[in-house]
Structures are given as structure tokens and as C-alpha cells.
């Protein structure tokens, strides 16, 4: 069984750092505090701890800093906020004057670097009310044990919009992302060798150089400007256009399939059981979810009933095939197994909902998609005419426009670009003129849609000998990159270093003689070896997240941690792609 989340990965590292840097720093025996959070820190804390954890740290009430609140002048307040004008202004309103201040005193902890302008504003207004004011350098969300995001989905538009009027805003976004990435490295106690994918765009190069400079600044240890030596780790920075296929392909592993086909919002799955509407959060506290989320849907549909039969056969409570109704009856008969069984009911519902969508109109699509993506069929024979493979999908009235667009994109990606005439014909015949920018705008990510000349496709690792399901033959490109990085096979021209002193990377876990041994809480979470940290500009897919776990499992000497601006799903990505050539005032942003 998977270990509980408290023993696993990035989430526990982040929680322990917050515990040490914030709660231990302002702890006073027997004293309770009110905690104020903004939108970002609410997500951050929710990702790595529970309310019971906060109660243990002396937090009695949690409030939204943006909302009007009643004063509680006999209590001290702990502000855990982002160093933004909005959050700082909300803090200042709480301590506007001595007669109007809401709390007895304030402890302020910023997620990362607070600009001098904001710091001086605080200092000038209410310094006498402040007991602490610190920066703790955690400006990312630990989504999973090996996955992080910066929670900046709007960065996609600014990084890939062709509108020159967005250039200055793009620079601000890149600077902010670099600051956030440095906090990921700092939290992991890593000073990695920084590399980037040199093509097709220069975003990765620019961001990598910013990150390297900020790492140098962060790890300066004295006035002589000495830098902490590079640790046995690498940070790879990549533009989203490096693998367009994995973003639109229908995936049949459980987590990726569920988030693609079902309306799951904020990791919350809604379902019906026993005639009642219910909700379940898909999170790593659920050991069964951790166990099955990366498995193929066919395996999941076999495994969950098998687990149920183990329980039922032990108690001789049910006989025959395990169904949802049988599970409901079993919970009534054995209330002490209720929690265990209810999780299995959730995941069986989830799997069955996925399969219902799959059988309705996705099953036939998947074979076409795999053939187009790989250029070979299930028998390994080369596809001679991709258009003949695509046509049945375009003519099928049961497929909605989004699925047809995904298929057209896979056709174009598979042949590495088409002609303007052919693209116009496809758009007209499928009647997707209103959504044609979902196809054309991929060029802004450096993906060849209508290239001026035929380009060679990047070589892929031969995985023909690997055992796969026929409808799941595609392997995300990121897996090749992870494996090559660990085995020291990344081409230095294609993957330049921008570090002055790159780590010697051999994946063996060997540590340089210059590197001082460290004994701290991070060692509990770190494998006896190296770390590979990946950052993708513009979103990662659930299938790419899965690869981090698979490669870590296969290469015991290296832990792979993957992150991005945000996590994407195919439909949301296509909506974002469509908006790239729109002016900023026509685009809806997260904070507006």
C-alpha cells in the first residue's frame, strides 16, 4: 500500500517548512491566534495541511484577508500572505489607526520577496503593531507529492501571445515565475544546474537565465559574493510547444481520463449513489486513489471490485459479482468498514462514469488518435495516408467539434505541418470556422501548423518492445526527456546549460567531495541520490505528471519532480489557444 501523505514527498516538505518558518517562529505557549490568508496562501495551506494541523499550531480562526471582518482586539493575528499590493493594502486597512485596528498585534509572513515599496509602506503605517515581518520563500503549490504549480494560468497568454503590446507585461510575468521557481529549489534545498530546451522558442532560454541569476542571488552566503555550490540536481525548463500531442490526445489512464471526460472542478468529483448526490475530493490522503490513479482504466475496473471481494469474502458478507448496489448493502451490514468501502464506491463510480463516456463516443476515436500520433497502427505498420485515417472521425456526427479539432490537430502534428490550402479545406469541411484559431494559434507556441518548408520530426525513443494497451501506445515526450536527463544523454546543443558550475550528472547518487553533507528534515523525504526538477512554461498534462512517478520508480537513484504554471486539460487548453491572438481586453484573467 502507498504510504500516507504525511510520509510522502513535496507536500510534507512544504508543510514542515511552513511549520518551522511560521508557526514555530511565533509560537507562545497557551496563546491562540487568528490567521489571515489571501487567495494564494489559502490554496497553499489547503494543499499541504488540514484544519486539525492548524488547531495544533494554536490557530483558532482562519479568515479571508480580502473580506470585511469584525475586530477581535484581544487577539493577535498571523498574516500569511503574498507580497502583492492587494494583500498588503488589506493588511494596512486592519491597522489603519490605533483606535481602528482589528487585532492586538500582527505577525506577517510573506510567501516570497516583498518589494521595498510595499515593505516601506507597511513600515511607515503601522510598524508598532508588528511583532514579526518575514519572507519564507514558498511561492508555489505542492499539488501532489511530486508535482508543483505556480498557480499562474494567465502566464500562458502573456508568454505566447503574438501581440507586441504585451511585451512589458511578459517581462514582469517571467520575472515573477523565476522568483517562484527559485522558491521551489530553496524549499528542496537544491541549487541545481539549470538547463533549457533551445527550440522552438526562446521563452525557456530567457526564463532559465533569470532563474540562474536569482539562484545565485539567493545562495550568496557572505559579502564576498561566494555562491553555495551546485547540488546533485538538474532543473530543466521547457516551452509548452515541445510536445503538443500529449495535450490533446485522449488518455486512458485513470486520473488523466477522468479529468478530461468528467466535470471535475477543484479536484472535486460529484456522483450519485443510493439515489443521493455526493461529492468526493480526489487527493493523496486517499490511499486507494494514489494506488490506482496512474493505472489504465481497464486495470482499475478489474482492481477495485477485486479489493471489494477481498473484504466481502473475509466477512462472508456478499457473494457473486461486486456491483455498486452490492457495495452499498455491504456498508450497511459492516459499518466498521464504511470508510474503506465508501472510497471504493467513489472510485468505482468514477471508473464507470469514465467508461460510459468512453463507450458512448471515445472508443473509436482512440484508435484513430493513436495511429495519427504515432504514424503506425497497432501492428506496427506505417500509416501510409493519415488523411484516410482522419476522415471517418470528421464524418462521424456523434463526435462534437472539440473532439474533431483534437483529431485534426493530431493529424497536423503527426505530419509536422500542412499546407494553407489543406488546412482551409479541413476547417471548411468540418465546419469549425469559428474555432479555427484553436488550430492556427498553435504556431505561436512554435508548433509547425503551416510551416514555410517541411521540417524533420524529432526522433523518439523506440518503445515498441514495451507492453502497452492498443489504445494507449503513445508515450508523452517528457518521459524520453526525463530518462535521457537521468542517463546523461541530453544533447548539450539542444539542452544548453546556463549555469556557471553545472552539477556533474550521472544519476548514480554520487556526491561531489566539495559538497557538504546535510542533515535536516529534507533528508527524510529525499531518495538516496539526485533530483531532476522540471518546469514547463504553459501547463502540464496529467499524463506528464504520471511520467514523473513512473520514471522515479524505475530509476531509484533519482527523484523526478515536475511543475508548471498550471495543470491543463485538453478543452481548457484549446480555449486558451483560441484567445492567443485576441487583445488583452478580450481575455478573461484569473484575478479579474
Swiss-Prot record:
Ubiquitously expressed in all tissues tested. InterPro entries: Sec-1-like_dom1 (IPR043154), Sec-1-like_dom3a (IPR043127), Sec1-like (IPR001619), Sec1-like_dom2 (IPR027482), Sec1-like_sf (IPR036045). The keyword Transferase does not apply. Its main location: cytoplasm. It comes from the Eukaryota. Residues 1-255 are annotated as: Mediates interaction with DOC2B. Phosphorylated by PKC in platelets in response to thrombin stimulation; phosphorylation inhibits binding to STX4. It is found in: Cytoplasm, Cytosol; Cell membrane. Pfam families: Sec1. GO terms for cellular component: apical plasma membrane; basolateral plasma membrane; cytosol; phagocytic vesicle; plasma membrane; platelet alpha granule; specific granule; tertiary granule. Keywords: Cell membrane, Cytoplasm, Membrane, Phosphoprotein, Protein transport, Transport. One of its GO terms (molecular function) is syntaxin binding. GO terms for biological process: brain development; cellular response to type II interferon; exocytosis; insulin secretion; intracellular glucose homeostasis; negative regulation of calcium ion-dependent exocytosis; negative regulation of D-glucose import; neutrophil degranulation. Belongs to the STXBP/unc-18/SEC1 family. Interacts with STX4. Interacts with DOC2B; the interaction is direct, occurs at the cell membrane, excludes interaction with STX4 and regulates glucose-stimulated insulin secretion. Together with STX4 and VAMP2, may play a role in insulin-dependent movement of GLUT4 and in docking/fusion of intracellular GLUT4-containing vesicles with the cell surface in adipocytes. This is Syntaxin-binding protein 3.
Amino acid at each position: 500500500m502507498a504510504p500516507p501523505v504525511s510520509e510522502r514527498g513535496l507536500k510534507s516538505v512544504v508543510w514542515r517548512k511552513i511549520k518551522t518558518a511560521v508557526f514555530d517562529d511565533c509560537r507562545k505557549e497557551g496563546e491562540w491566534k487568528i490567521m489571515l490568508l489571501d487567495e494564494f496562501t489559502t490554496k497553499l495551506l489547503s494543499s499541504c495541511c488540514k484544519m486539525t494541523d492548524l488547531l495544533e499550531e494554536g490557530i483558532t480562526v482562519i479568515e479571508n484577508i480580502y473580506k470585511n471582518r469584525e475586530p477581535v482586539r484581544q487577539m493577535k493575528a498571523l498574516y500569511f500572505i503574498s507580497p502583492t499590493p492587494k494583500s498588503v493594502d488589506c493588511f494596512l486597512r486592519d491597522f489603519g489607526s490605533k483606535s481602528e485596528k482589528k487585532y492586538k498585534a500582527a505577525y506577517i509572513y510573506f510567501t516570497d520577496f516583498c518589494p521595498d515599496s510595499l515593505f516601506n509602506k507597511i513600515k511607515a503605517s503601522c510598524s508598532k503593531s508588528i511583532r514579526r515581518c518575514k519572507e519564507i520563500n514558498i511561492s508555489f503549490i505542492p499539488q501532489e507529492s511530486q508535482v508543483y504549480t505556480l498557480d499562474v494560468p494567465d502566464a500562458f497568454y502573456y508568454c505566447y501571445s503574438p501581440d507586441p503590446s504585451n511585451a512589458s507585461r511578459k517581462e514582469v510575468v517571467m520575472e515573477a515565475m523565476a522568483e517562484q521557481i527559485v522558491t521551489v529549489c530553496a524549499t528542496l534545498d537544491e541549487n541545481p544546474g539549470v538547463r533549457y530546451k533551445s527550440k522552438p522558442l526562446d521563452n525557456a532560454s530567457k526564463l532559465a537565465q533569470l532563474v540562474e541569476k536569482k539562484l545565485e542571488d539567493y545562495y550568496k552566503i557572505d559579502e564576498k559574493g561566494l555562491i553555495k555550490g551546485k547540488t546533485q540536481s538538474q532543473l530543466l525548463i521547457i516551452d509548452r510547444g515541445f510536445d503538443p500531442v500529449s495535450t490533446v490526445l485522449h488518455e486512458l489512464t485513470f486520473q488523466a481520463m477522468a479529468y478530461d471526460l468528467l466535470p471535475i472542478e477543484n479536484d472535486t468529483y460529484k456522483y450519485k449513489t443510493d439515489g443521493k448526490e455526493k461529492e468526493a475530493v480526489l487527493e493523496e490522503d486517499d490511499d486507494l486513489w494514489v494506488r490506482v490513479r496512474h493505472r489504465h482504466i481497464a486495470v482499475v475496473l478489474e482492481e477495485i471490485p477485486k479489493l471489494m471481494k477481498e473484504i466481502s469474502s473475509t466477512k462472508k458478507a456478499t457473494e457473486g459479482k461486486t456491483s455498486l448496489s452490492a457495495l452499498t448493502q455491504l456498508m450497511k451490514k459492516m459499518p466498521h468498514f464504511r470508510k474503506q468501502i465508501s472510497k471504493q464506491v467513489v472510485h468505482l463510480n468514477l471508473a464507470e462514469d469514465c467508461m460510459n463516456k468512453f463507450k458512448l463516443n471515445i472508443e473509436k476515436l482512440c484508435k484513430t488518435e493513436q495511429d495519427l500520433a504515432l504514424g503506425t497502427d497497432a501492428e506496427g505498420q506505417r500509416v501510409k495516408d493519415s488523411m484516410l485515417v482522419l476522415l471517418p472521425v470528421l464524418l462521424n456526427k456523434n463526435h462534437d467539434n472539440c473532439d474533431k479539432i483534437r483529431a485534426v490537430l493530431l493529424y497536423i502534428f503527426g505530419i509536422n505541418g500542412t499546407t494553407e490550402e489543406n488546412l482551409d479545406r479541413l476547417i471548411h469541411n468540418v465546419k469549425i470556422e469559428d474555432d479555427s484559431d484553436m488550430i492556427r494559434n498553435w504556431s505561436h507556441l512554435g508548433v509547425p501548423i503551416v510551416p514555410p518548408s517541411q521540417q524533420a520530426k524529432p526522433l523518439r525513443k523506440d518503445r515498441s518492445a514495451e507492453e502497452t494497451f492498443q489504445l494507449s501506445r503513445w508515450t508523452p515526450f517528457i518521459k524520453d526527456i526525463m530518462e535521457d536527463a537521468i542517463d546523461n544523454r541530453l544533447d548539450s546543443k539542444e539542452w544548453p546549460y546556463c549555469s556557471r558550475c553545472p552539477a556533474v550528472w550521472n544519476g548514480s547518487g554520487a556526491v561531489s567531495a566539495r559538497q557538504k553533507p546535510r542533515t535536516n528534515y529534507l533528508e527524510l523525504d529525499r531518495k538516496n541520490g539526485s533530483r531532476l526538477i522540471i518546469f514547463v512554461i504553459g501547463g502540464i498534462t496529467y499524463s506528464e505528471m504520471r511520467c514523473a512517478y513512473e520514471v522515479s520508480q524505475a530509476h531509484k537513484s533519482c527523484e523526478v519532480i515536475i511543475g508548471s504554471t498550471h495543470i491543463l486539460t485538453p478543452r481548457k487548453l484549446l480555449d486558451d489557444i483560441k484567445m492567443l491572438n485576441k487583445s488583452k481586453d478580450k481575455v478573461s484573467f484569473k484575478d479579474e
